[in-house]
């Protein structure tokens, strides 16, 4: 289906051409004065310069040609030369029925040429718990992935684990100090290693920070960790077996935590998976003359003549031969081109890493790791701050674990749901349902609270505001969906058959209903724009507008008590479409709605 605004533009453009003017002046936009009209065209103002006449003479001619067009209720020429447009309610009702018939798509066309897109998000380090700093990458990345999937593309989400380098040597060295008798440290051992890990996730989460602290104050410990890292990367059997245990224990816990966030990765690759590609990549860069030595390090120059600021070279290997994040990211691109051959790779990472990605992207292009046809995108996000405007911390100033934050919000929502239950005596929700509902609503509060902000901007994580059932919040959106579900349930309980409603939506009978239809009609344009700009906040803004439009219609209209049966069916059919579109949108944002609250 064509976007409503495009259909309107086509009609207005035809009128401009019929009146003797260039088609470029027929573009229509949403009205910036909704009190006067629904859409507007300012083309006559620009055309007046070319055709050397007063703009209102042009707008008068165009308006006269559109006077009898069935698409419009009215097209008014307003001095000095604007066209104010109102939609015909019958045309709008047909557009609604067409959207409803287009099951699961609602007028949004699928991509004609589906792309293969890799989304690199999450990026946790193994052996360390997820903290609040991991929230934005996970939440924004999951939504960007889901939006692209809804558009019809083949999308692969990769967690890109931090599982390489000194941190592994630190863990092995600390474990050796704690449990020196473990068979993994016996170099003469040739048998099979135990299948069960010699530590729990709790122990592992204590081992890493302890080891990290020691390495800063104890030089001999750091040297032992560096040696362990080298031996691990050199293939020492016992250390390889320990690495396998570290990965299994850590990834199991990470999956549990991401599951609680409703975040799912197609690939669980780590930096270690890219390491086999490093030697060949480095050799290629040397052979082809891309890489050269600078102050002992191997670098690739990536500055360009058009640069307005200094872009340092991309370091491939340090002076001691060690690789860096840039090395791993480039080798990961080599691996992805070989295994996935993506048309686009999207990275979700802190906006402060923008220089790193400029260097990596330029190096990848210059050295031919990726062809010109593959798009590389960095979505840089701002920080999540506390009410004091500083990065979000625990009450004692530490970094808050993500699961503790989610638990805090779950508890807050559970209290609100129980209070709501006391106020509504007929709402009998048992403890298990209340807890599940609280989790569902809390997740919406967290995700919507994040995603409703433009990704690049910092935002204040305000638990009180995010968990409110009023205003621009996740719980308000869910409350609206639950309200619609309740009306539909009552309709069916009285014998109504929702599945039999075909082309039932009739022309709007009041302003609230027309406003709801106009909001629904924006769905395809909104999702297309959110995809093109990788901007989930546009979907949040849309569903807030849609929820407000529905609630306005609900308060102005007797729905279930409507005596005219055809009109009641029209209302119910419109509610079904509203519910389905809201549900499709929140699914793209990565959360769902309960049946009642």
From Swiss-Prot:
GO cellular component annotations of the record? cytoplasm
Q: What is this protein called?
A: Arginine--tRNA ligase
Q: Does the keyword Cytoplasm apply?
A: yes
* GO biological process, alphabetically ordered: arginyl-tRNA aminoacylation
Q: Which Gene3D superfamilies match?
A: Arginyl tRNA synthetase N-terminal domain, HUPs, Isoleucyl-tRNA Synthetase, Domain 1
Keywords recorded for this protein, A-Z: Aminoacyl-tRNA synthetase, ATP-binding, Cytoplasm, Ligase, Nucleotide-binding, Protein biosynthesis
Under catalytic activity, the entry for this protein gives: tRNA(Arg) + L-arginine + ATP = L-arginyl-tRNA(Arg) + AMP + diphosphate
What family is this protein classified in? Answer: Belongs to the class-I aminoacyl-tRNA synthetase family.
Q: Which gene encodes it?
A: argS
Record motif 'HIGH' region, residues: 124-134
On the tree of life, the source organism's domain of life is: Bacteria
User: Subcellular location, in the record's words?
Assistant: Cytoplasm
The GO terms this record gives for MF are: arginine-tRNA ligase activity; ATP binding
Q: What is its EC number?
A: 6.1.1.19
Q: What class of enzyme is it?
A: ligase
What SUPFAM superfamilies does this protein's entry cite?
Anticodon-binding domain of a subclass of class I aminoacyl-tRNA synthetases, Arginyl-tRNA synthetase (ArgRS), N-terminal 'additional' domain, Nucleotidylyl transferase
**Subunit relationships:** Monomer.
Q: What is its main location?
A: cytoplasm
Q: Which organism is it from?
A: Agathobacter rectalis (strain ATCC 33656 / DSM 3377 / JCM 17463 / KCTC 5835 / VPI 0990)
